[in-house]
Amino acid sequence: GSRFSERVTGDRNRYVGKKTIIQLDIDPSEVDKNVMTALPLVGDMKENLTKLSERVQKLEIEHWWHTIRAWDATENRSAQSGDRLTAPWLMKELTRSFKGEDTVFVTDVGQNQMWAALHLEVDAPRHHLTSGGCGTMGFGVPAALGAKISRPEAQVVQICGDGGFKMTGMEMYTALRESAPFITVVINNSCLGMVRQWQQVFYDKRYSSTILTPFNFVGFAKACGADGATVTTCAEFTAALAKARKQGKNFLIEA
């Protein structure tokens, strides 16, 4: 089902290397389109995976998990950088603040989605809503609205970038109208971060249509009947999050 796009593989030559690639897809036109495979299996995923698993030996991967946990511990330490607000720290703070609670996290699309996937810890199934690799910028706000209407007893926290919020942010008014409050965290880097990153890595920093003009996110939220705060430090973020939880209404934090 993977298209082996550059957002999945990065540098395809380095990604492929000496690997033996088996591609499973329902669509034959996707086979060998981006990466040459040793064994293409076209058809129903469940049927093909069942047959494939019968021929694959079970691997002992405990040592690999130890390596991953060591990386995670290193990343956790690097995320602590005084009072300077970083995306990894922000995700860890959200995890800490809502630990053990019935909280549904919703991510938009872009670097915010990647940071959440790496550093946000979710305790239960169906408590992390994401559009995966579909690239649906603007998914966050309406998805959070739907989650809150579906499960009004749960706390809903929506994480997005400045680009994604600008696409569907007006739904905050719908949330007001429907009495469906949730917390929105906008990670604002004043650009379409993931596209800009690819322009930097693959296109010799030839930036095009990725730098965004300033926008008053908190003012916009207040115009939609919500409250909000702009934060630049860890302490400010923690205080704003506590205020958002106490108020129990739509609240936007621009970080």
Task: Give the positions of each predicted feature.
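Glycine-rich, acidic loop regions that bind phosphate or pyrophosphate groups
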Residues: G1-T67
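Active-site glycine- and acidic-residue-rich loops that bind
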Residues: R3-S5, R84-P88, G164-M167
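Thiamine diphosphate
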Residues: N13-Y15, V31-V42, K46-L52, M114-A255
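Short, well-ordered loop/turn elements at secondary-structure boundaries
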Residues: G17-K18, K99-E101, Q247-G248
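Generic enzyme active-site microenvironment
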Residues: Q23, V106, I159-C160
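Active-site diphosphate/adenylate-binding microenvironment
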Residues: I68-E153
